[in-house]
């Protein structure tokens, strides 16, 4: 994780809602956590690019069709999956796995795809005891 989590995001947007327990009767921030959980307008997604030279640094614009829908938060090379990887918050309606997005790299638009996580070994088949 890099710039994906800060004071402008919440755990539910970042896919970390499992780490928030709302079972206590009262605690500071409980009302805000409940509101955040029920009013999600965006979600953190993983975007991959087949071209390993398309490595985003962050802040690159993302468009779907002709509309800018977000900006890259962080990126890097996924050596194990042999793809470039980026993370971005996108409006909920654009977060479906398989959705194509265009990202601007140094003045050129390149197509990436929203992918399910984890990107590596999603079935946990490589874990060995």
Language-model region placement:
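Conserved, structured C-terminal
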Residues: 1-129
């Amino acid at each position: 994780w890099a710039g994906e989590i800060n004071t402008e995001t919440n755990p539910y947007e970042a896919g970390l809602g499992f780490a928030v327990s709302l079972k206590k009767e009262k605690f500071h921030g409980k009302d805000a956590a409940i509101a955040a959980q029920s009013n999600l307008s965006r979600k953190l997604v993983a975007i991959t690019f087949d071209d390993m030279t398309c490595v985003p640094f962050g802040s690159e614009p993302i468009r779907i069709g002709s509309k800018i829908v977000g900006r890259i938060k962080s990126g890097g090379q996924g050596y194990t999956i042999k793809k470039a990887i980026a993370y971005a918050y996108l409006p909920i309606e654009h977060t479906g796995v398989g959705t194509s997005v265009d990202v601007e790299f140094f003045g050129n638009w390149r197509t990436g795809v929203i992918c399910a996580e984890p990107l590596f070994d999603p079935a946990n088949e490589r874990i060995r005891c």
